[in-house]
Curated annotation (Swiss-Prot):
Binding locations of [4Fe-4S] cluster: 131, 165
Pathway: Porphyrin-containing compound metabolism; bacteriochlorophyll biosynthesis (light-independent)
UniProt protein name: Light-independent protochlorophyllide reductase iron-sulfur ATP-binding protein
Amino-acid positions noted as binding ATP in the UniProt annotation, renumbered to this chain: 46-51, 75, 216-217
GO biological process: light-independent bacteriochlorophyll biosynthetic process; photosynthesis, dark reaction
Similarity comment: family membership: Belongs to the NifH/BchL/ChlL family.
Entry function: Component of the dark-operative protochlorophyllide reductase (DPOR) that uses Mg-ATP and reduced ferredoxin to reduce ring D of protochlorophyllide (Pchlide) to form chlorophyllide a (Chlide). This reaction is light-independent. The L component serves as a unique electron donor to the NB-component of the complex, and binds Mg-ATP.
């Protein structure tokens, strides 16, 4: 089963109509994830997507759900707090068998973490070469081949930075909802606007829709609220800039493993509420991105 690279326009089918002259990774329709709720987590680089994704995975697991988290970043640190270590990536293990995928066992690339959360790190191609979308496609292909998606309730893709090229937008082809992690500042909101544009493009041909915003490392929400009200987004959860959250990552722990304190318990409750809301189902948001100049004007820049 090949994962072809589709360049430029095409007549019809998945991967088409995503923008004239664009380079898109067209995923085989047989790789669709149909048995689980699938979320793709995006946001500005360094905004805390991996911490957010891992804590959300843990929250889903505490609801009794069978969870799979897929890290889509060459740094392969998405599942670090769930597994307490850096696990081998799919690309690493494929390279070890000269890319003969049939020689791999499930335990070579999938690892159990906190409270039974299953963890995979897709990894990425060498710097300056290859395509991240191909890596994501091959990861899902392996999971399907080993029947690892059949008993899964929730899949979370934790995606590299705010890159929304045809490659790292590939998880959008599998997702039901996209969650955007954002801080209450211009750079984060500017990145969020680009992600909103990518979702609007992908939604023409795939089932993915915007789920909402996860405000992170932010005392206030005024800038996020201004943007949300303008484009049609909603904030689903709000996590302040707390030292306790930073310490949890330094301790290789999800937030539910930290010693209880009022602020820790409040963060845990917010993650549980977010997981419950997402599991119950959310209405898709039909947000429309702003032009760059409009964002400057909206947020008070001359």
């Amino acid at each position: 089963m090949n994962i072809p690279l589709r360049i430029g326009g095409c007549a019809s089918g998945p991967g088409c109509g995503d923008g004239e002259g664009s380079v898109q990774v067209a995923t085989d329709p047989l790789l669709a994830i149909e048995t689980a709720k699938v979320f793709a987590v995006y946001g500005k680089g360094g905004i805390g997507k991996s911490t957010t994704s891992s804590n959300l995975s843990a929250a889903f697991s505490k609801l009794g759900k069978r969870v799979l988290q897929i890290g889509c970043d060459p740094k392969h640190d998405s599942t670090f707090t769930l597994t307490k270590r850096f696990v081998p990536t799919v690309i690493d293990v494929l390279e070890s068998v000269n890319f003969h995928a049939e020689e791999l066992r499930a335990e070579d690339f999938i690892f159990e973490g906190y409270n039974g959360v299953m963890c995979v790190e897709a990894g990425g191609p060498p710097a300056g070469a290859g395509c991240g979308g191909y890596v994501v496609g091959q990861t899902v292909k392996l999971l399907k081949a080993h029947h690892l998606l059949e008993d899964t309730d929730v899949v979370i893709f934790d995606v590299l930075g705010d890159v929304v090229c045809g490659g790292f937008a590939a998880p959008l082809q599998f997702a039901d909802r996209t969650l955007i992690v954002c801080a209450n500042d211009f750079d984060s909101i500017f990145a969020m606007n680009r992600i909103v544009a990518a979702i609007a493009s992908k939604a023409k041909n795939y089932k993915v829709r915007l789920g909402g915003v996860i405000a992170n490392r932010s005392a206030e929400l005024d800038q996020i609220d201004n943007y949300n009200n303008r484009v049609g987004l909603k904030t689903m959860a709000h996590f302040r800039d707390l030292d306790a959250i930073r310490r949890s990552r330094l301790k290789k722990s999800v937030i539910f493993e930290m010693d209880p304190s009022p602020e820790i318990l409040a963060v845990q409750a917010e993650y549980m509420h977010l997981a419950e809301t997402l599991w119950a189902g959310t209405e898709p948001l039909d947000a429309m991105p702003l032009k760059d100049r409009e964002i400057f004007d909206l947020l008070g820049y001359d």
